[in-house]
Amino acid sequence: MALPTIAIVGRPNVGKSTLFNRIAGERISIVEDVEGVTRDRIYATGEWLNRSFSMIDTGGIDDVDAPFMEQIKHQAEIAMEEADVIVFVVSGKEGITDADEYVARKLYKTHKPVILAVNKVDNPEMRNDIYDFYALGLGEPLPISSVHGIGTGDVLDAIVENLPNEYEEENPDVIKFSLIGRPNVGKSSLINAILGEDRVIASPVAGTTRDAIDTHFTDTDGQEFTMIDTAGMRKSGKVYENTEKYSVMRAMRAIDRSDVVLMVINAEEGIREYDKRIAGFAHEAGKGMIIVVNKWDTLEKDNHTMKNWEEDIREQFQYLPYAPIIFVSALTKQRLHKLPEMIKQISESQNTRIPSAVLNDVIMDAIAINPTPTDKGKRLKIFYATQVATKPPTFVIFVNEEELMHFSYLRFLENQIRKAFVFEGTPIHLIARKRK
């Protein structure tokens, strides 16, 4: 099951994103700073009192070109659709506005827990003014200053109190995967073709896939899979005007729940910025990845077409050198039979554990090939390395000074580890840590 979801809503400039970042804190880890990996966030995971939850920053979905009230309406609709708990942020400096009242009326209809956070209460004298917000009819207003972190704990306490019951543990032997990509790249047709039967509605018009339904199936070897459909383009019979930004959020939720992500690209249209943005989210989330070029049957090809495509994909997705590329057709089912086996292999890579002794042999061999760098006369010393996690495989390298571990040398060590062990389709994380 997915983690419970918290939506942070409110009119522009009340501090939604600041509160979002404050709650997310350092749990949003940017492992690499590579061009093409997106840095913006509308979705993250938070934790408080041993309860984990997903968060949506609706401020990240604002359409700045849309009319003011349309932005707010869009946020409220997303919160109603997606959230288990809603945090409604208002400004203590400005008091209640017409836009606040509009959002409140929308939230009454959700029948979901709403936490009223009065932001920008930066000094004790302002606390007396927050009681005016009782007039919104959403219960006790909680004074906070998200910039300074004041009152954030009270909001988190309220979130945890209102979370649904603990979700059941999932079967770790079931491989979860999702197909992500721009609307109308053929995800629904691929799903149908993979399953061999019609389970969802397939249509050439974006906005015709109904509610997401997890689909379970077993291959001929008895391996169980759960396919998580991003769906959500059309809910309650209504197509959201800002479909692409809404689909980003849906894709990110699917990525969060997946072990392996199939990034679907439309061969007729080529690679778009949206593709790189979504792939960047999956990469940063540490998910296994396959790049799937669909509608391959529609292209006129010569002996160089596939090679040219592969080179272009590697150039456009420089942060995904580990991701295999497959050219398929949902219509003719070309190469689709290979996907379940590829997903299994990548899942195995994600769960690989390397004994410390073997890992350190590889590290020492790497140093012999390419000695550690120096900075201002001081040389980096590597004492030992150990694997600390899987999904994705994560290694801590203990050194004399973290600052001496240049990014380029860390990348060199990653490449040497990849040569020694099979990590196809999965990112691996290397972390330099000073030995104490």
From Swiss-Prot:
Keywords: GTP-binding, Nucleotide-binding, Repeat, Ribosome biogenesis. Residues 352-436 form the KH-like domain. InterPro entries: G_ENGA, GTP-bd, GTPase_Der, KH_dom-like, KH_dom-like_a/b, P-loop_NTPase, Small_GTP-bd. It comes from the Bacteria. GTP 1 binds at residues 10-17, 57-61, 119-122. Residues 4-167, 175-351 form the EngA-type G domain. Disruption phenotype: Essential for growth, it cannot be disrupted. GTP 2 binds at residues 181-188, 229-233, 294-297. GTPase that plays an essential role in the late steps of ribosome biogenesis. This is GTPase Der. It comes from Streptococcus pneumoniae (strain ATCC BAA-255 / R6).
